[in-house]
């Protein structure tokens, strides 16, 4: 299965809440309640993805708790603690132009406008004002760089993103 076919992890199941099988939810979505916009969920239970349905959810203080279909006891809920919550890639919402999912940018080759290969996107760092590409430099980088941090600011630094070709072109000095 390729990376684009793998389930997309949106959160994880936390500890049990109460005696009726409810679970605390840790969501990686922009808003905590945004995870409930995706139906159905997949959970990775004992190494195998399986589909689950959320029957209801609510805020519980600062936490969010949910009831899953078929989970009716505290013991059943405890068996699911720390299971990842995911969806199929085709369930991902369509984005506007110049918006990208982090998972799609990771692994892209980054070159500058002069054709110099700066390396591969290893991760995305969220800074609050804008995301930053953490680019792992090639082993034989002519400038001796191990990694570069390039602000993901379209028009100013990011000139082109080709997700099909896994290429990003940037206006960036390789010595910086």
Swiss-Prot record:
InterPro entries in alphabetical order: PRC_barrel-like_sf, PRC_RimM, RimM, RimM_N, RimM_N_sf, Transl_B-barrel_sf
Superkingdom of origin organism: Bacteria
Pfam families: PRC_RimM (PF24986), RimM (PF01782)
Main location: cytoplasm
Gene Ontology BP terms: ribosomal small subunit biogenesis; rRNA processing
Stretches assigned to the PRC barrel domain: 97-176
GO MF entries: ribosome binding
Subcellular location as annotated: Cytoplasm
Transmembrane feature ranges: none
UniProt KW Chaperone keyword: yes
Secretion signal, residue range per the UniProt entry: none
Record key words, sorted: Chaperone, Cytoplasm, Ribosome biogenesis, rRNA processing
Keyword NAD (UniProt): no
Assembly information from the UniProt record: Binds ribosomal protein uS19.
NCBIfam families on file: 16S_RimM
UniProt record similarity statement: Belongs to the RimM family.
Comment on protein domains: The PRC barrel domain binds ribosomal protein uS19.
PANTHER family named in the record: RIBOSOME MATURATION FACTOR RIMM
Job of this protein: An accessory protein needed during the final step in the assembly of 30S ribosomal subunit, possibly for assembly of the head region. Essential for efficient processing of 16S rRNA. May be needed both before and after RbfA during the maturation of 16S rRNA. It has affinity for free ribosomal 30S subunits but not for 70S ribosomes.
Protein name: Ribosome maturation factor RimM
Species annotation: Shewanella denitrificans (strain OS217 / ATCC BAA-1090 / DSM 15013)
